Amino acid sequence: MGVTSTAPHLLRAARGEIVDRPPVWMMRQAGRYMKAYRDLREKYPSFRDRSEIPEVAIEVSLQPWKAFQPDGVILFSDIVTPLPGLGIEMDIAEGKGPIIHAPIRTQAQIEQLRPLEPEAALPFIKTILQALRQEVGHQSTVLGFVGAPWTLAAYAVEGKGSKTYSIIKNLAFSEPAILHQLLTKLADAIAIYARYQIDSGAQVVQMFDSWAGQLSPQDYDTFALPYQQRVFQQIKQTHPDTPLILLVSGSAGVLERMGQSGADIVTVDWTVDMADARARLGKQMKVQGNLDPGVLYASKQFIRDRIIDTVRKAGNWGHILNLGHGVLPDTPEENVAFFFETAKQLNVLV
């Protein structure tokens, strides 16, 4: 552990230190709302190229850093990026998300999956993270991220995103032993991948269990929570000082369960009032969030008022200011700039 005072702002807050204002970053802060990103996309139309060619992914990751100086700079990637390393071939269709060419639905397919070897399968991740650390130094915190077992299983089994998750739920409720095998293999691969990101330079790691909010609480306890715990426990065994964040979309019904995952920080979405989230999670749990991304369509006064309201409700400890999910593609770029400007002045405004 380095001298604390040189640690960047977000990392200090994520460790539970008292800071003068909540650190701020934004999910999907590198993305389509930025003209610089859209220009680069014309040159590199394939998402996999943009996220797997190191110099391109480095440039994209740093676009919001150069524009807004957020307290966190996150790796530009996708949660399905490690799947080919297990033998699950995929592509990422523009505007549609991941597509798995041969969905995993049988015992035989699961048995054929191989352990993840990130040095061989994902060497570009190390190059990108090392470059981000070098670029931002102590001025910002470099974040890595991974998908959670349930959510990666949902993509692998469904073959793509879904509104109903009927195929994976059919598997979960009809042949649970098969799904548990897949979830176990995914959890172990995700833990290996997260450790690799930390070893490559990630200072904080967020795990996205985007689709776990589609589960009833009792099914969350069976198919999501134990595997979140498995991932976090394995990371903590080797990297006990790296703060870990958990996100579940539509998490209002499972918020307390998220607090049992082993995460250090729970991302709260906008369907839960931040004051209620604080009360439900308890004083020891740190939180991230939770503005509705739609707020960024509004007037500057409205945006400022919502930021101040969120920060007041979160209190003066253990809060990372963020949206409740990713910034929307048609958000006015100047409103994102204003969001960051306001966030940087919170020690005066609140």
Curated annotation (Swiss-Prot):
One of its GO terms (cellular component) is cytoplasm. Its EC number is 4.1.1.37. CDD domains: URO-D (cd00717). It is found in: Cytoplasm. GO terms for molecular function: uroporphyrinogen decarboxylase activity. It catalyses: uroporphyrinogen III + 4 H(+) = coproporphyrinogen III + 4 CO2. Catalyzes the decarboxylation of four acetate groups of uroporphyrinogen-III to yield coproporphyrinogen-III. This is Uroporphyrinogen decarboxylase. The gene is hemE.
